[in-house]
């Protein structure tokens, strides 16, 4: 029996950082940001809203939506590129916050593709019979690693969390029909956080050289994002025995409107069926696709047999596609 999503949830901080706000702290303008990214505002977490907290709050909503109790969860997979600590894991911290029993809980790092990687792990666990009810969380507080003097990156990122419950297929659930994932470490330098790990530990020099902020080669990342997501999506569709016309909704990673539009043009999906949250939340990294999926399910009726195509791309480089079908 295939694995399915029983319920979803999301969490967004209350603080809003608009393009007008950014005009006051860096050389940029609302027009410059809007035309190049499609972003109008983004949410910024407070000091108390760290990644594990946002993920746990999203998880509470997913558990409620799935109509299960916390005691039924038997594994937690937490995707994040901005963990609270190198260790303990954000998964373990979220587990403690939620008051869930002592079940397996671990982090997954696939940057902005993290939600799809988490779904893939949960699908494998459920379909193998290893676990029955997996909580997938994706949350990132990237504002902690954004240089607000770098207009090429500070305009892009926002904070947030998303979650879903994955179990065996049941009526009203979203069946995880097919998954395609990939990575290319040879291109890792295109999008990274240079310091703070074992290769380049934190030091006075790394702080002075601003090496604890996100760096990105924008033009190269754009090209890879479009090409890799298109490949993953088309491979996923083919392996599922489907055609592009069989896709009813496209739910892409909310990185940049130009990237989203470039992907949408490559598929036979109407503009009205390309779901976007980018303008109001910006790029929320690993949580991006999960937030968009949760909002889509809360604001639209997904009919039986309709198919959703989720696509994402992130640092690593990493990319992926997932096909969901309403049952």
From Swiss-Prot:
Q: Name one GO biological process term.
A: secondary metabolite biosynthetic process
**Locations listed in the record:** Cytoplasm
| Annotated region described as ACP-binding, given as residue ranges | 254-258
Q: Report the leader peptide range.
A: none
The UniProt catalytic activity note for this protein reads: malonyl-[ACP] + acetyl-CoA + H(+) = 3-oxobutanoyl-[ACP] + CO2 + CoA
| Gene3D superfamilies per UniProt | 3.40.47.10
Alphabetically sorted, this entry's keywords are: Acyltransferase, Cytoplasm, Fatty acid biosynthesis, Fatty acid metabolism, Lipid biosynthesis, Lipid metabolism, Multifunctional enzyme, Transferase
Q: Which superkingdom does the taxonomy of this entry point to? A: Bacteria
- The question of whether Cell inner membrane is a record keyword is answered with no
Biological or metabolic pathway of the protein: Lipid metabolism; fatty acid biosynthesis
Description of how the protein assembles with itself and partners: Homodimer.
Domain comment? The last Arg residue of the ACP-binding site is essential for the weak association between ACP/AcpP and FabH.
Name the UniProt record assigns to this protein: Beta-ketoacyl-[acyl-carrier-protein] synthase III
Native species = Chlamydia trachomatis serovar D (strain ATCC VR-885 / DSM 19411 / UW-3/Cx)
What is the phylogenetic placement of the source species in the record?
A: Bacteria, Pseudomonadati, Chlamydiota, Chlamydiia, Chlamydiales
Gene this protein is translated from: fabH
